[in-house]
Amino acid sequence: MSILLRPSSSPSLCSSLKLFRLSSPDSLIDAAVLRNRTKPSQSFRMEVVSSNSTCLSSISVGEDFPSEYEQWLPVPDPESRRRAGVLLHPTSFRGPHGIGDLGEEAFRFIDWLHSTGCSVWQVLPLVPPDEGGSPYAGQDANCGNTLLISLDELVKDGLLIKDELPQPIDADSVNYQTANKLKSPLITKAAKRLIDGNGELKSKLLDFRNDPSISCWLEDAAYFAAIDNTLNAYSWFEWPEPLKNRHLSALEAIYESQKEFIDLFIAKQFLFQRQWQKVREYARRQGVDIMGDMPIYVGYHSADVWANKKHFLLNKKGFPLLVSGVPPDLFSETGQLWGSPLYDWKAMESDQYSWWVNRIRRAQDLYDECRIDHFRGFAGFWAVPSEAKVAMVGRWKVGPGKSLFDAISKGVGKIKIIAEDLGVITKDVVELRKSIGAPGMAVLQFAFGGGADNPHLPHNHEVNQVVYSGTHDNDTIRGWWDTLDQEEKSKAMKYLSIAGEDDISWSVIQAAFSSTAQTAIIPMQDILGLGSSARMNTPATEVGNWGWRIPSSTSFDNLETESDRLRDLLSLYGRL
């Protein structure tokens, strides 16, 4: 292997360079020698090149290196930079209207994140959640959650008057029904004023609606919502046959009768997009990348399934043959029955996975990078008969593998994804992840069970990996610690080299930052040292989830101690 020294402004490599190549003592060395230089250059970088380069010339072993030799230093690959970030969903921000939003608190958080030295903000899926608030069981894979729209930002855009805003409410946790009742009428009013207007904002709305990368999912979503609002059925499976199967005449009739609803739906999505892109652009200016999150599956009662039935495993009547889930695991003795329809991967392959290509393109529009939940489902997926009551009766089936990601790369170019590879991880999952270069995950709460070969222990981490103190599905560090028995605590304290447990949250945070993993992500709850009451989600439960908000006594302006502590640790472990 040869080492090429390349000046940043050299007009001709061959005219100014020779190449050094160390070989056996009896052989010659191909050397890169800068001619006619009297001062060392600071602008060299070292690269590996093939030994048969046409620029090579030879000198004998033992001859002097040029005076610039000590300047031939390797330049770090920017893609290998160590970094850290915080997991905090926008619903968890403080705010006056019952739910966090994309207003001032989002910008304050980015400023605070920048002050800590963190360079990643991870969010949960931004899609409309289900009635319980879960963003992993929403009705659309591409739409934004309009409850995240800031009413104050609508005032700034001239779409609402300040006097129209409701009286502030002090809600310690998110109540989605209350937030919807409080905010939705005003968001609708703002959307109507936008449609009726004629200014620059109206022009941007039309551009948004006509963008092919947007319209390919937005029109279906708008029609689906209009029909659903009109019929109020349990699912699209119960709709009249012409609507259920998307007869053109039936859709035209819906447009005529529901034009205002459809136009308002699209305008609301534009308002979400506008506010989110403002937040994202501000984060970019502050050196913060936004990491999104994408559930692998979509809900049955969704525009995605209704408009793309051929891409899902449905019977002739449109009902799921098989549904999603996972076998028994750490979270459930009978497995988790998610109930989403499964993809017909063979049908998807026949049109080059166009549905997935469009979905990833949408993710690129929203995020700088994206975690894909349940990545293992691309290698092999757990299929449960739709009539089953528990997931444990399912079977493993072969997934699309690398062919899906080849099609995505061909369709949208280079993508940055993080593979959520927790649970039952077989060899084919590891091979698939490595074949596409995606980092996997390690979770420190899983590290202290088993022996020294536990893959979640820091000494077993990989460089191309994202380490978490815990995810949205875990308890907080403090809450998790309180559930451990004394033997487990003693083992963890010995590994973490701590004598006491008073500061256990920060001890685990430090362990995450010290990991060899390139990226470390810490939930905001752990930075605040909160207990189980701040847990975001408990898998296999249906109530009491997705409601956590930053305590009213906490402001990003008074988190200087936490900011300084984070920055010190990031500096210590090379993550600034």
UniProtKB/Swiss-Prot annotation:
InterPro entries: Glyco_hydro_77, Glycoside_hydrolase_SF. Its EC number is 2.4.1.25. One of its GO terms (molecular function) is 4-alpha-glucanotransferase activity. One of its GO terms (biological process) is starch catabolic process. Keywords: Amyloplast, Carbohydrate metabolism, Chloroplast, Glycosyltransferase, Plastid, Transferase, Transit peptide. Its main location: plastid. Disruption phenotype: Increased amounts of maltotriose and leaf starch. Disulfide bonds: none annotated. GO terms for cellular component: amyloplast; chloroplast. Chloroplastic alpha-glucanotransferase involved in maltotriose metabolism. Probably uses maltotriose as substrate to transfer a maltosyl unit from one molecule to another, resulting in glucose and maltopentaose. The latter can then be further metabolized to maltose and maltotriose by beta-amylase. Required for normal starch degradation in leaves. PANTHER family: 4-ALPHA-GLUCANOTRANSFERASE DPE1, CHLOROPLASTIC/AMYLOPLASTIC, 4-ALPHA-GLUCANOTRANSFERASE DPE1, CHLOROPLASTIC_AMYLOPLASTIC. This is 4-alpha-glucanotransferase DPE1, chloroplastic/amyloplastic.
